[in-house]
């Protein structure tokens, strides 16, 4: 018998490609790993292997686990706001568009609840992550203002936008993790109240 036949079959490694593609694969794999295992449940070597690369490849693109986590969160924000922008362009009255926005936010937070839990932990404990998170929040204020301007809606104060975003984000996290249901709250009623809040903001 050929000795090589007894060796475990190795997973095919991804072909060498452009650095941008390698980085994209690393970030995509890291997003799934952070979401599944949590920030503390993995390390840079495991993240590299999850993308199909050797650990050395990871360090060509990221200094450490924290840096790739920040890249993951930045892309998470991009995806969420792309969906919000598309929902605002969708035909329908303000309440219908608001319902669409609330539903996509709830689904997005539910899909990535593990990643969100790690984000909350790190923003409380790590000043670098906290500053990055606040930078993303400032960017969200600008994105919201631009979306309103593009739709021809009147501008609102940053304080009004902050209250809206804080409310949506915290409620979406609570509902994604079944916190509201555990407290005996009606999820449908919570959704309806969020739709009212978003409708008033459009």
Where in this protein do the model-derived segments appear?
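Amphipathic alpha-helical interaction segments
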Residues: 25, 67, 96, 100, ...
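Amphipathic alpha-helical segments used for helix-helix packing
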Residues: 106-128, 173-181
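Key DNA-contact positions within bacterial/archaeal DNA-binding proteins
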Residues: 56
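Short, charged helix-capping/linker segments at alpha-helix termini
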Residues: 40-41, 153-156
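Basic, helix-initiating cap at the start of DNA-binding domains
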Residues: 1-37, 44-50, 67
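Short amphipathic alpha-helical elements of helix-turn-helix/winged-helix folds
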Residues: 29-33, 108, 167
């Amino acid at each position: 018998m050929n000795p090589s036949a007894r060796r475990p079959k190795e997973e095919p490694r991804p072909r060498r490609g452009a650095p941008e593609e390698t980085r994209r694969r690393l970030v995509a794999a890291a997003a799934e790993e952070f979401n599944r295992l949590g920030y503390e449940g993995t390390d840079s070597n495991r993240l590299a292997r999850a993308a199909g690369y050797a650990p050395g490849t990871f360090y060509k693109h990221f200094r450490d686990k924290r840096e790739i986590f920040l890249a993951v969160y930045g892309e998470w924000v991009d995806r969420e706001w792309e969906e919000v922008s598309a929902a605002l362009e969708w035909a329908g009255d303000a309440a219908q568009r608001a319902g669409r926005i609330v539903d996509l936010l709830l689904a997005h937070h539910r899909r990535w609840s593990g990643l969100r839990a790690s984000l909350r932990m790190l923003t409380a404990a790590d000043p670098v992550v906290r500053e990055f998170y606040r930078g993303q929040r400032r960017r969200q204020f600008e994105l919201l203002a631009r979306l309103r301007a593009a739709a021809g809606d009147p501008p609102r104060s940053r304080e009004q936008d902050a209250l809206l975003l804080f409310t949506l984000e915290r409620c979406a996290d609570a509902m994604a993790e079944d916190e509201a249901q555990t407290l005996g709250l009606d999820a449908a009623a919570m959704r309806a109240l969020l739709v009212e809040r978003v409708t008033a903001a459009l």
